[in-house]
A protein has these predicted regions:
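Exposed, low-structure sequence patches enriched in small/polar residues
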Residues: 11-13, 19-30, 34-266
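Outer-membrane beta-barrel transmembrane domain signature of Gram-negative proteins
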Residues: 1-10
Length: 266
């Protein structure tokens, strides 16, 4: 339930509301407010706000994020409150946004490896919880130099401060994504390339010593061609740098790989 009131002026917008969440017959109230002011019309607007909510950490959500978690877990919901500010706008062929936020998270879920009982060589992950503050800095740029060409770049940096744990175990703090796509033949042939970078995450080895896993540097290219209006073929070549990395301790990711298939659109 998120009741809110929004007032629009000539160059400003004010939203005031509240986010009401419930869990185990308990109710939680979070702010849902934002103020935006157009400094230079659509070219530049500044904004500030407050928000929050209850992240319901059920087993499906957690196992989607980490497929190697244990089946028996102490599952708790995460309570999040955030205050933020930033700017956004459009300048010619460019759309941009930048934002800095401060979050307080109660029951932030962290992941540490443990030996599987029936197979000590295989790792599973237990959940740990901590109260954390996170400063998040993020920005994005989208450009259309010509109608057939689109370029995008997004980056984010999280600065964690934890109450109990030494590190944000298995949580990345930096991500960068870039994509270039070009429509070679209108509605028929497309080529694209992508870049994805992520810092190495902290974990603990079998002796309980702190360990920093390798970072990710992934470059990919691909193409798609529609033979008919609704039927086409695609080919993707991923991880051109053949980056060998463990996103989860003892579970290496796939190196250079090629994927092809059929595309359908309706």
């Amino acid at each position: 339930l998120q009741p809110a009131f929004t007032f629009h002026g000539d160059v400003f917008r004010i939203k005031a509301g509240i986010n009401i969440a419930s869990s185990d017959d308990n109710f939680f109230f979070f702010p849902d407010a934002e103020v935006e002011y157009e400094v230079l019309g659509n070219n530049l607007a500044v904004f500030a706000g407050a928000g929050g909510g209850l992240q319901k950490n059920n087993f499906l959500y957690l196992s989607t994020y980490n497929p190697y978690i244990n089946n028996r877990l102490d599952i708790r919901n995460s309570k999040i409150t955030e205050y933020y500010g930033g700017l956004r706008g459009d300048v010619g062929i460019l759309t941009y946004s930048g934002r800095v936020g401060y979050k307080k998270i109660e029951n932030l879920a962290l992941f540490l490896p443990v030996d599987e009982l029936l197979n000590p060589l295989r790792k599973r992950f237990d959940l740990l919880y901590d109260t954390a503050t996170v400063i998040r800095i993020q920005g994005s740029i989208l450009a259309h130099p010509i109608s057939e060409l689109k370029l995008s770049l997004t980056a984010s940096q999280n600065i964690f401060s934890l109450s109990q744990e030494a590190r944000p175990w298995h949580l990345p703090s930096f991500e960068l994504k870039g994509k270039v796509s070009y429509e070679a033949i209108k509605d028929q042939a497309f080529v694209y390339a992508g870049l994805f970078m992520q810092n190495g995450v902290f974990t603990k080895d079998e002796e309980g010593k702190e360990l920093l896993l390798n970072a990710l540097f992934d470059i990919s290219v691909g193409a798609e061609y529609f033979i008919a209006k609704n039927f086409g073929l695609f080919l993707d070549i991923n991880n051109l740098a053949n980056n060998k990395r463990q996103r989860w301790y003892r579970y290496p990711t796939v190196g250079l790989n090629i994927l092809g298939g059929i595309s359908l659109r309706f």
